[in-house]
UniProtKB/Swiss-Prot annotation:
It comes from the Bacteria. The keyword tRNA processing applies. Residues 162-309 form the TRUD domain. Keywords: Isomerase, tRNA processing. Signal peptide: none annotated. The keyword tRNA processing applies. This is tRNA pseudouridine synthase D. GO terms for biological process: tRNA pseudouridine synthesis. One of its GO terms (cellular component) is cytosol. PROSITE patterns: TRUD, UPF0024. The active site is at residue 86. InterPro entries: PsdUridine_synth_cat_dom_sf, PsdUridine_synth_TruD, PsdUridine_synth_TruD_CS, PsdUridine_synth_TruD_insert, TruD_catalytic, TruD_insert_sf, TruD_pseudoU_synthase. Responsible for synthesis of pseudouridine from uracil-13 in transfer RNAs.
Amino acid sequence: MTGHPDCPGFDDLPRAHGEVTCRGRIRVSPEDFRVDEILGFEPTGQGEHAFLHIRKTGENTDHVAQRIARLAGVKPMDVGYAGLKDRHAVTTQWFSVRLAGKADPDWRALESESIAVLRHTRHDRKLKRGALAGNRFRIILRGLEGVCDGLEARCAAIRAAGVPNYFGPQRFGHGGRNLQEALRLFADPRRRIDRNKRSLYLSAARSYLFNRVLAGRVEHGSWNRGVEGDAFMFTGSNAFFKTDKLDEDIQRRVEALTIHPSGTLWGRGDPVISGTALAMERVALAQCAEFREGLERCGLEVGRRALRLPVPDLEFAGVEDSACELTFSLPAGTYATTVLRELVEFDPQGWPDT
């Protein structure tokens, strides 16, 4: 991850569970990386929006959405999905298509060697970005080298303590290109740019600042425990609360992984934190005025993100023929790479954009 003199690469970010001693390869084939979307609600079975549950292999989400629009005879904007899925994978995800007053076409016409329609139904609302509970992963690591007999113990440690909730390398584009584009945007905010690209570049800049804050907390040993002045977030929620006193109840809830210290998603407004937490954040971002001021000029509002990512269902299938299998689920907006990097060393630039 490059694009700024002080930008650390993703693999340079500090790990919470010690240095890894095992190296492996990811995505040797699409079948090695499976993602199943967890929608989080059941379609009603009626309404003007058709809902399609699709399995795709080696297919781009936008490309599938365009095929759906052509078959249904609607505009691309009438097709919705909750999030982009990795093209170099076998993934299942839901799509919606607005068919007001129209019958369903024969959805079997979508099917090919790389696309299968698993189910179709109806719902009363369009599927919007981010409207999912999370994703379930099954990942096979191949070509394992080094000292790998500690993987099962590391998985147990992650189940107990979670991992740092870094934004993954996908967020920043190949070679940190999205950060470079963000700096160009900050230098000339009036430059005409596609709305989606603008959002992508601003998100990359804000994610970079968050990763710096989190890296400082990992080095300090407080990414998974509270410090004075912290704001805490609830598991599975964006809600947070501020406390000036770290009493036994707060620490017990942190240890139980029901609440987590949080970091600032930079923008205009009060970051909420104070004291030690605020001082640590200021140190982490002292050299980042260009990003901080640019995000504020572009109108982003301040937000918060948990510093810790729980992975309570992480399972490990033992090493065999220099390969192993990992299964786990993550909430929306988090990254499988943040889990994998605590287990094995791999090339983050080999991870495709999503």
